[in-house]
Curated annotation (Swiss-Prot):
Protein's name in the database: Probable septum site-determining protein MinC
Record's function text: Cell division inhibitor that blocks the formation of polar Z ring septums. Rapidly oscillates between the poles of the cell to destabilize FtsZ filaments that have formed before they mature into polar Z rings. Prevents FtsZ polymerization.
Annotated InterPro entries: CAP/MinC_C, MinC, MinC_C_sf, MinC_N_1, Septum_form_inhib_MinC_C
Matching Gene3D superfamilies: 2.160.20.70, 3.30.160.540
Pfam family, one: MinC_N_1
GO aspect biological process, one term: division septum assembly
Domain of life: Bacteria
NCBIfam families named in the record: minC
Amino acid sequence: MEEKKQQNVTIKGTKDGITLHLDDCCSFSELLKELDEKLSTHYYESDGRSLIEVRVKVGNRYLTEVQQEEIRTLIRNKKNLVVESIESDVITKAEAIAWKEETEIVPISKIVRSGQVLHVKGNLLLIGDVNPGGTVIAGGNIFVLGSLRGIAHAGYDGDSEAVIAASIMNPMQLRISDVTMRAPEEKEDGAEAAECAYINENNHIVVDRLQLLTHLRPNLTKLERGIV
């Protein structure tokens, strides 16, 4: 009995286009050859006005940028097809380290004094104060267990979902992503309480009571393990 040939490329139609499941064990050259053959055999007809979106899933195979471009070019050369995404279940060690740095909580215990700048890639948990003239900057969220009386910039790399929270919120300036808020009005003596700042639907920074944070950003609960 003739042995059935291993299928390295599986094509599945979806309501949004097609999905290509590519085997992660065969050689890359074998994969490209079979992909070319199968896409040439199947003719995908569109309405003439729109392209058919293709999602490519490569499993546990890591693709270099050059290899990804080879796949994109091959698919692009077939009529009516355009690559929407190429998805892999693996990343390089360098990418993993970069992701960890961007998402981890960095706990620091100190006072940020006037003229000093504290900068972290991920989420900042500062146990201490930010004095007037001091600056804290984070790629993610900023949590200050103390007084925030200087400048705080969260989401500096464009994260508009980032928040700033402090036990005592009386800053010189707040900035989230590219949105800036000057110092809010000073509170009456004894009126200081834990507050948070976030960007609202009108693209303005709003300062409100800390208790609202879990409703505004429910995903922040995932950071609790990093804080505790």
